[in-house]
């Protein structure tokens, strides 16, 4: 699977490029206990999910407890990349249908990497993301993980990515 490139080819030049990005981020956030960041682009198909997956993998390989969150509630894809279930995810938690522990799944590829998929497509993604429950979601994750990486929807297509900015 090319989306999990750094897992499949950890010694490649591409993997080294992701390590370089990690090192630069470490320099910028030095001294911070927890780090939440998102990968954003203006339109679909640019590589947000690819970069999110590989950055999360690099942090997990570095020994950091990492969670990768699929926050594109309108067009979920992260679950396909890892071959895991999307029956419950962020939308389930935000709608009050699942607890945080119920939606966290091990990646099955790296011991320090967990995945939270988007879950079933809700009728009201923007409202769920704007809710107080979403703030609680991120606060709870900060108590469990060193790095929280958010795979977002395209910035110019829906308001969801803008709503997420207050959490990263």
Give, region by region, the residue ranges found by the protein language model:
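P-loop NTP-binding module
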Residues: 4-168
